[in-house]
Amino acid sequence: MAGSTSASLQTPYFPSSTQINPVRVDHTLPLPPAQPSLSFTQGLLVGQLSVVLLIGAFIKFFIFGEAPPPPSRGLSNRTSTHPRSYSINAASTDSSPRLLREKPSTSNILRPVPSSSTNTRSILRKTYYSATPTHPTPKHGRPRLYHSSHQPESLDWFNVLIAQTIAQYRQTAYILKDSPTSSILASLSETLNNPEKKPSFIDIIKVTDISLGEEFPIFSNCRVIAVEDPNSDGGRLQALMDVDLSDDNLSLAIETSLLLNYPKPFSAILPVALAVSVVRFSGTLCISFVPGPRTSDQTMSPIPTPHDTTSEAIDDQSSDQSSPAQNPDGPKDAHANTSNTTDASSKHGIPKTSLAFSFLPDYRLDLSVRSLIGSRSRLQDVPKVAQLVEARVQSWFEERVVEPRVQVVGLPNIWPRMGRTGLRSSQEEPEAGSGSVEIPVMTSPGTDGVSGGGGSGGGSGGGGGSMRGIDRGLSGREVGYEALRFRHAACGGHQNQSGRDGGRGGNEQFAMPGSMPDTVTET
């Protein structure tokens, strides 16, 4: 029994349908994770340091960073080609450095300006202006002008300034029209009747009509060029600009008489009336700065004493120079002050910088000349008279402001001084503007010879406004700004009527400005 049991244990019985699968042992067991080279503390420190660096970079480049400057006048494109040099502040290489404790001499306190920083090329380089300098190739006695490669300027801002200046001159001339010494009428009459220039066969010239115009000149196409000048080291700069004035009523009318003094004085008298108007003017204006005439060419005044060169004396001279504008009733004092200022400016033989302007010969000046010759049988608009007047005006203009002749004007002293200091407030501007606009209508009695419009309504035939070509219904403000035109005639003579006597009654007759007194006959 025991033997059978052991035999059964050694040889187990398996059913035929049961299969034994072999057991497979996997030897690729997962390895334990590798230990990190940095500890937790070290990683924390590295992370905090990275965050601090990022925050610092953000603050530096985004919060405290400088924004790039906006491009202005194309300076970014010109900086590389026109590097700025500071030759005035830079010390010369051959001179030894001066110690700060070393006391400078009284005659060498002001640092000298190098000639290389004041010549033409240095000025153009430092102002980033491209211009082609000229070469001494004379043409008709003048150096040839080369156009600048720089973009021309429009000069819109300059037109506004010039228009304001001209408008102020027109307003001042109209306000002072009744002044016996400061009016433009008195100045023209004195100039036309100069005994040194007026021939003996011409009678007294009477100004009958003046029109200062309503339009303003338009400047454009400004360019700066370099011109060779033997009187200036390195040449000089010249600004060329186109100017055009058209559709304006700038005119002057006069009347006089031609005297026949043979065989006896005043044997015959031929009345003549002329009216000259500027239809259009266009040309090229040249402006440059030139040194003024030296004292050797002028009448020198005595050398002033040292106390005259102090700041108080200079302030007194500046106040004296502005006194003629404040005191128009004192022409003698104004002339004396002007002469004193001129003498003071020419002391020590030092030339003063002046502004020179002229026009190129290719200008255009169109005139309209109307004439009336005779007393009873009259000739109107004679072509030969118009040609003579136009030729004379053209010659007068060319002899003064056409190249190579220039007009030289001394520059005013613009150094700030307390004598010229003013105060501008918001309350004073409206008052000043209203005060300048209100211009009263100037009337004249019936016996005076003011020509132009007659009285309105029941006014007399000779009385009325002093403006020609303006309706009676205009107020004083409109009269002052419409045309700035006024008339003048001698007292006690016949009045130049325009057919508007006594409230526009009867047939209206018209006459040319500056015509003879009996041009129009009453019906």
Curated annotation (Swiss-Prot):
Biased composition (Polar residues): 74-96, 105-118, 295-312
InterPro entries, alphabetized: Mmm1, MMM1_dom, SMP_LBD
Gly residues bias locations: 449-467
Ranges of the Cytoplasmic topological domain: 65-523
TM region positions: 44-64
Single annotated GO MF: lipid binding
Principal place of residence: endoplasmic reticulum
Xref: Pfam families: MMM1
Keyword hit for Transmembrane helix: yes
Intracellular or extracellular location(s): Endoplasmic reticulum membrane
Region of interest called Disordered, as start-end residue ranges on this chain: 70-118, 295-349, 420-473, 492-523
Membrane topology label: Single-pass type I membrane protein
Domain SMP-LTD: 151-412
Biological role: Component of the ERMES/MDM complex, which serves as a molecular tether to connect the endoplasmic reticulum (ER) and mitochondria. Components of this complex are involved in the control of mitochondrial shape and protein biogenesis, and function in nonvesicular lipid trafficking between the ER and mitochondria. The MDM12-MMM1 subcomplex functions in the major beta-barrel assembly pathway that is responsible for biogenesis of all outer membrane beta-barrel proteins, and acts in a late step after the SAM complex.
HAMAP family (alphabetical): Mmm1
Membership in a protein family: Belongs to the MMM1 family.
Known partners and oligomeric status: Homodimer. Component of the ER-mitochondria encounter structure (ERMES) or MDM complex, composed of MMM1, MDM10, MDM12 and MDM34. A MMM1 homodimer associates with one molecule of MDM12 on each side in a pairwise head-to-tail manner, and the SMP-LTD domains of MMM1 and MDM12 generate a continuous hydrophobic tunnel for phospholipid trafficking.
Name of the protein in its database record: Maintenance of mitochondrial morphology protein 1
Organism per entry: Paracoccidioides brasiliensis (strain Pb03)
Gene: MMM1
